[in-house]
């Protein structure tokens, strides 16, 4: 920087709303883990089913993701990465399929899928402190899982923080 240039001082004062923001606490408004929706089981049903979220047919890859997620037992979680490894795919592709899941909460419990670092994230595109994460945490708590204040898995129904991967 030359001598003729000066550094700009911050114009924000301590009274600026950016300095005094209060953290919003989200309360779950959807903790349903019991509703069972129709799931196509035959080839013909799968071929003709229209996803109400997209108004398009569900892809073969999405059905592969959903079939695998359906195997995750209540009180357990797996990761997007573990699913993608099993499917020989990518975690983002798995997340995209779950974001469009029209069969939740059951028979396809996408709320049982968490990030590789064992934190809740990606649920309906939500990360961090948001309504979607609060809802997912409430669903998992109803199934016996515990998370810390940063939404990281502390224990599953077995009392440990293991990830389900027994496909």
Where does each model-flagged region fall?
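Short Lys/Arg-rich cationic patches that frequently serve as NLS/NoLS or arginine-rich RNA/DNA-binding motifs
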Residues: 2-21
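Nucleic acid-binding interface residues in structured DNA/RNA-binding domains
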Residues: 17-167
């Amino acid at each position: 920087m030359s001598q003729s240039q000066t550094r700009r001082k911050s114009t924000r004062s301590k009274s600026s709303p950016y300095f005094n923001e209060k953290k919003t606490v989200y309360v779950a408004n959807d903790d349903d883990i019991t509703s069972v929706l129709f799931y196509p089981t035959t080839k013909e049903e799968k071929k003709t089913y229209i996803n109400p979220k997209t108004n398009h047919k569900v892809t073969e890859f999405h059905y592969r993701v959903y079939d695998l997620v359906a195997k995750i037992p209540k009180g357990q979680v797996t990761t997007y990465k573990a699913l993608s490894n099993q499917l020989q795919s990518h975690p983002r592709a798995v997340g995209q399929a779950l974001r469009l899941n029209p069969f939740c909460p059951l028979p396809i419990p996408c709320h049982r899928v968490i990030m590789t670092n064992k934190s809740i994230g990606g649920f309906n595109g939500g990360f961090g402190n948001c309504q979607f994460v609060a809802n997912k945490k409430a669903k998992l708590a109803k199934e016996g899982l515990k998370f810390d204040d940063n939404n990281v898995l502390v224990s599953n129904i077995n009392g440990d923080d293991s990830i389900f991967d027994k496909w």
